């Protein structure tokens, strides 16, 4: 047995058995593409578990993270974006990140990079429409950026995110208070100011953050619901703030 990432992989004696048991949907052509992209000359089944202590576990760890652990459609969707971006066009992924590939310049292989970006753009559009509905292109982009910035603050600056969340709840409890949320400014990272009595917040972040973050996931969908639930005549008079 092989233990990786605090998970015991049962009956895994080689990379080949790992593919057949832990990576559903991976067949021979996919394995050959990996071997070609990462320039592995030896077959995967030659690396046994007993030799993995001396062998670099990066390759196996890479597969274990990107492939889903079951046949759930949500895990499969999460893996599709990785397979489309790395497996199908590893060179394009390197060029997109501004990194050289096999000694080439970053400006080369433009056609494959263009095709890869088209596939990724269509994939993102489909996912955004599933989350936010059939909104226009600009609204989709704004919603996606607002959700991303809100999640970024929650994951990296949780104390500031919680302070903004408490400030929002405190403001909404007041009577005759209209809470304005500027989605355009939030999508550009212009988040305003915190209260001067904020504790545990640096001066730099006080100038960047107010009640524009601190929301639950999907807050933009609820915020835009009123805009797209009215008639066309009234909709023309409304605008995102």
From Swiss-Prot:
InterPro entries given in the database record: Rbsml_uS13_C (IPR027437), Ribosomal_uS13-like_H2TH (IPR010979), Ribosomal_uS13_CS (IPR018269)
Subcellular location: Mitochondrion
Keywords: Mitochondrion, Ribonucleoprotein, Ribosomal protein
GO annotation terms (biological process): translation
Signal sequence extent: none
Key word Mitochondrion present: yes
Major localisation: mitochondrion
GO MF term set: RNA binding; structural constituent of ribosome
Record's GO cellular component terms: mitochondrion; ribonucleoprotein complex; ribosome
Keyword Repressor set for record: no
Annotated family: Belongs to the universal ribosomal protein uS13 family.
Name by which UniProt lists this protein: Small ribosomal subunit protein uS13m
Organism taxonomic ancestry: Eukaryota, Sar, Alveolata, Ciliophora, Intramacronucleata
